[in-house]
């Protein structure tokens, strides 16, 4: 049992994992997507209300068209093959990011998944796709200014984010052996505890998740206070 309300994961290391195993980048990304399916039972067992996965950043658009096209295709395949199982297990799906950059057919697929699962309450699985936190904050401020407000409060920004109901991040996990948060949930993770692992995401397993949570449980959170 854990008191974590929001677990965020940067799914890093797919391409390096592929290089290590003499595989293509596409095979590495597929292994990363398969890992979500593998870890779903653990996510459900932990009963953490909100889990956000960083799957495709706003910066990822700058990669080769072949890699970008495959990553977009992976999201479509994942929603197509996993949606019924997610729905059956009571998972509410949310997707955040600049989704207008995606094709109309994929946007429709995303909206259908959100609509189908909107009343589920076991856990919320939020997929951050075409997402950048700076962009999210800019979009929120633009929305507020467009509404006619001349002064902006914390509350105004919170309510203008892609998902106003998203709780603050308690624990942010990044596999892959690098130590940065890469423009991910900067607003929501203001007081998050950070956990970094040298293991690549496709090698990550439920015991690694548990190890991160155990490490988190030993920390004394101060939320910027003493």
Curated annotation (Swiss-Prot):
PROSITE patterns: UPP_SYNTHASE
Cofactor(s) needed: Mg(2+)
Species classification: Bacteria, Pseudomonadati, Pseudomonadota, Alphaproteobacteria, Rickettsiales
Keyword entries, A-Z: Magnesium, Metal-binding, Transferase
UniProt superkingdom: Bacteria
Subunit structure: Homodimer.
GO BP terms in the entry: polyprenol biosynthetic process
Protein name: Isoprenyl transferase
GO molecular function per UniProt: ditrans,polycis-polyprenyl diphosphate synthase [(2E,6E)-farnesyl diphosphate specific] activity; magnesium ion binding
HAMAP family assigned to the protein according to its UniProt record, in alphabetical order: ISPT
Organism: Rickettsia sibirica (strain ATCC VR-151 / 246)
Residues the record lists as binding substrate: 13-17, 25, 29, 57-59, 61, 63, 174, 180-182
Pfam families, alphabetized: Prenyltransf
Residues reported to bind Mg(2+): 12, 193
Co-factor binding details: Binds 2 magnesium ions per subunit.
Family membership: Belongs to the UPP synthase family.
Described purpose of this protein according to its UniProt entry: Catalyzes the condensation of isopentenyl diphosphate (IPP) with allylic pyrophosphates generating different type of terpenoids.
InterPro entries, sorted: UPP_synth-like, UPP_synth-like_CS, UPP_synth-like_sf
EC number(s) per entry: 2.5.1.-
Active site feature: 12, 60
Gene3D superfamilies named in the record: Decaprenyl diphosphate synthase-like
